[in-house]
Amino acid sequence: MKGTIFAVALNHRSQLDAWQEAFQQSPYKAPPKTAVWFIKPRNTVIGCGEPIPFPQGEKVLSGATVALIVGKTATKVREEDAAEYIAGYALANDVSLPEESFYRPAIKAKCRDGFCPIGETVALSNVDNLTIYTEINGRPADHWNTADLQRNAAQLLSALSEFATLNPGDAILLGTPQARVEIQPGDRVRVLAEGFPPLENPVVDEREVTTRKSFPTLPHPHGTLFALGLNYADHASELEFKPPEEPLVFLKAPNTLTGDNQTSVRPNNIEYMHYEAELVVVIGKQARNVSEADAMDYVAGYTVCNDYAIRDYLENYYRPNLRVKSRDGLTPMLSTIVPKEAIPDPHNLTLRTFVNGELRQQGTTADLIFSVPFLIAYLSEFMTLNPGDMIATGTPKGLSDVVPGDEVVVEVEGVGRLVNRIVSEETAK
């Protein structure tokens, strides 16, 4: 699997029923209005026969599902045309820890090494009434039917392609029921469905799994892009949040990246789109279970990004959700990397944002809540970081709305200067 793995939560009616009462309470206050998207990064993807690493002391659930495989570039596809963009389907397993909340991105639950086995692609025309079976050690353990999904494959492809261009090889996991099968080290998990070759994986204590030296490569020059929310106390206060006690990490899809001196589109009929100047840390070598003291040894260097957000699309599900943060071209980033040796202290850099020459945002990386080495140690505790992976470390206070015609310049001291222009949807066509 060489593309981006998108997945959707709360897409089975049993999940919505189970969480119905909770979704009326804080922090949700209402059921989700749109599909609740998340990303399974490249470290999660394994093939049939490869071991699923079992993290010590955790409860782990097998989430048998089916993956839609994109066959050609898809942008703003109508539901009735979706079949033209589907190469086929594959059995998949959205392995997960139990969900305690859907408010913030579930990176610890969903993004661990080997937590996304995917089988062979089969050229089926429709999976809207497909029964998916799970066997554990050769015995039936569970089954469910895709007819009980809230949104079918065509609806999901249409909804995702409305804001994110999909490329050949990308996949969409269609969802899982609320009830899933608990797995243990020593189990063999088999996912079955008519018309598909079985997807079978052993479950192995993660201490016995040799770190994979290579992972499926994405069809773009970048690795996984991790981003931090509320990692400056003044920015958290600006948005009326308490500073987080644990890093608020979310993932950004490749479609959102663009370069220096490029344009970003402000969608029609929105009220607030803002910039975010950020220092980006680029990983230089594979990192797993790295200590904070050793973490800087795994840094290749630094670059700059502008992590735009469309606040109109915020919902209290996996906040900040993909519609806010992973729209096409919404993350300008410099293509150059400044070697870490040229930046003696990444925690003493000034960040600035100018809009049409006016200084709108200024801060310092000295105010990071979670430092660069802490973030590397934190992430590598439960997942493998690979060369080319990036961590956008968050933004200080000073947000303001930007509109078509604005020139937005973000600077990080010693790292670089990034220029971007805002255009309307009509201009972008």
UniProtKB/Swiss-Prot annotation:
Gene label: hpaG
Assembly and binders: Monomer.
UniProt keyword Repeat present: yes
Function: Decarboxylates OPET (5-oxo-pent-3-ene-1,2,5-tricarboxylic acid) into HHDD (2-hydroxy-hept-2,4-diene-1,7-dioate) and isomerizes it to OHED (2-oxo-hept-3-ene-1,7-dioate).
Binding annotation for a divalent metal cation: 276, 278, 307
Source species: Escherichia coli
NCBIfam families documented for this protein: HpaG-C-term, HpaG-N-term, PRK15203.1
Pathway: Aromatic compound metabolism; 4-hydroxyphenylacetate degradation; pyruvate and succinate semialdehyde from 4-hydroxyphenylacetate: step 4/7; Aromatic compound metabolism; 4-hydroxyphenylacetate degradation; pyruvate and succinate semialdehyde from 4-hydroxyphenylacetate: step 5/7
Protein name: 4-hydroxyphenylacetate degradation bifunctional isomerase/decarboxylase
